[in-house]
Amino acid sequence: MLEYEALGEGQCRMAYLTASLDDPASAACGRCDTCAGPWYPAEVNDDDAEAAQTALNRVGAPIDPRSQWPVGMPRLGIDLKGHIPAGERHEPGRVVARLTDLGYGTALRELFAVGSDGRPLDAPVSAPLAAACLRTLREWDWEQRPAAVAWVPSLSRPTLVSSLAAGIAQAGRLTLLGPLDLAPGAAPLNRSTNAAYRLRDVLHRFQVPEAMAARLPELAGPVLLIDDLVESRWTLTIAARLLRQAGAGMVLPFALAAAG
């Protein structure tokens, strides 16, 4: 199929197909685009080109807060059901793009690829993606500008998420609170389970450090909570809940990408 797609002028597509099937009567058809020329417009007008470039350069996709606990938590021995209290939720958040998007989605898919050994690749956030993050933050129509930055610790990409959080705090002149603590014995998450199991796995995964908890009630604005990749949203839901229980006001989640 790649060879078929790459056929050029003078290489008949129909002749290619019939020759591949050992047809002794294979001959140029005279009608396909390589024989008769493209039947579709081959030029793009300036307005369409500008619209396409604008779409490719677009940043910002929403992270909606979860409003209910998954069904079945009591069966796992966890007493959570019904609505998540409003005072424990995060506000609507943002990612730069979804992994399925064109434009920045391409760079983000490369960023979250794994190496030849099957392990996640970890490096500081690149300058182009850092600039896209700052654009996303500038275009965010939040009710109140954040006053501080905290981040979700990562076992797979610790350098990426810490560099992202530190860079945003420096650029925005925000207080850098640091990361949440990982609970002792925390292991890489199993991302193939359903919502109830995902929540179970992150429910006691994080802790608010004492030094951070002491500063939260004194902040003059929301906490910007940084993560690298949003998948089920349960990690951000629980991390924000911990921050709010520890005295934070609004929590605004932000990440590089969302899966799906």
Predicted region positions:
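Active-site-facing substrate-recognition patch
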Residues: 48-148, 158, 162, 166, ...
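Short loop/turn motifs at secondary-structure junctions
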Residues: 28, 145, 247-250
